[in-house]
């Protein structure tokens, strides 16, 4: 489990995305074989919008865990998930030896109305965490925003929601990307004051294209110096 890595002064990880085309999964395997040589502590695998790539997420996570022999962190989103599909995915991950999950709300599909969203069985990460804990001894990570979740009124409200997730059983937090270290240090101070004392891993992203940066900044709520 990732928990065994938490004692290290520096925890290094990478993230991969399931391919849209089935044929491209072998290219992901090749990339993972290269990433393995960097000796990451874990590799996370994202989850498609609305659960569109859930099977690929489980398959790639299993490759990371069993072939690359690196801890795999499978993303899991509330949006697009129901009780049956959650249990099926957890069973599949457990069967494949994947013990680490990143519990997220996920992005609402553009075609989903607010009314449809409100009718979902799971809407937020806070809905997922108790169900994950009931269905296996998983290490559960959560996401956090050093510069406030774009949908939160303010950072105080944001940290209250974060504390709720931690109290439900999160084992660690991974931040969205940020560029301002001072914002991160300030955020960490506020977490301590709120009684949040689980490990927090800083999320960074190499900038390879201006368009990519713009999209990522919008999703993460981070400021650009």
Placement of each model-derived feature along the sequence:
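N-terminal amphipathic alpha-helix/helix-capping segment at the start of soluble metabolic enzymes
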Residues: 1-14, 21-22, 131
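Hydrophobic faces of well-ordered beta-strands that scaffold small-molecule active sites
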Residues: 10-18, 43-45, 72-76, 101-103, ...
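Active-site mouth loops of central-metabolism enzymes
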Residues: 11-27, 72-84, 141-157
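Active-site pocket-lining/capping segments in soluble small-molecule metabolic enzymes
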Residues: 23, 119-145, 197-225
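Glycine-rich, positively charged N-terminal anion/phosphate-binding segment
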Residues: 25-33, 51-70
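Catalytic domains of carbohydrate-active enzymes, especially glycoside hydrolases
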Residues: 31-46, 165
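Glycine-rich, proline-tolerant flexible connector loops at the mouths of alpha/beta enzymes
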Residues: 39-60, 108-120, 171-185
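Glycine-rich anion/phosphate-binding loops
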Residues: 78-95, 119-123
């Amino acid at each position: 489990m990732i928990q065994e890595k938490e004692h290290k002064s520096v925890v290094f990880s990478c993230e991969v995305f399931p391919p849209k085309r089935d044929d491209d999964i072998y290219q992901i395997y090749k990339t993972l074989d290269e990433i393995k040589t960097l000796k990451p502590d874990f590799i996370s695998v994202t989850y498609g919008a609305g659960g569109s790539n859930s099977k690929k997420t489980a398959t790639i996570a299993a490759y990371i865990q069993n072939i690359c022999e690196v801890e795999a962190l499978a993303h899991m989103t509330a949006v697009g998930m129901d009780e049956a599909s959650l249990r099926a995915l957890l069973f599949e991950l457990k069967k494949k030896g994947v013990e680490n999950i990143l519990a997220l709300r996920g992005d609402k599909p553009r075609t989903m109305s607010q009314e449809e969203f409100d009718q979902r069985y799971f809407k937020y990460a806070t809905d997922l965490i108790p169900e994950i804990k009931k269905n296996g001894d998983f290490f559960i990570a959560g996401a956090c925003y050093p510069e406030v979740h774009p949908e939160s009124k303010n950072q105080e409200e944001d940290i209250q929601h974060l504390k709720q997730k931690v109290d439900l059983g999160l084992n660690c937090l991974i931040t969205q990307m940020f560029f301002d270290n001072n914002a991160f240090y300030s955020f960490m101070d506020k977490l301590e004051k709120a009684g949040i004392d689980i490990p927090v891993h800083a999320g960074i992203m190499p900038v390879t294209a201006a368009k990519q940066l713009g999209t990522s900044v919008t999703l993460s709520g981070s400021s650009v110096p």
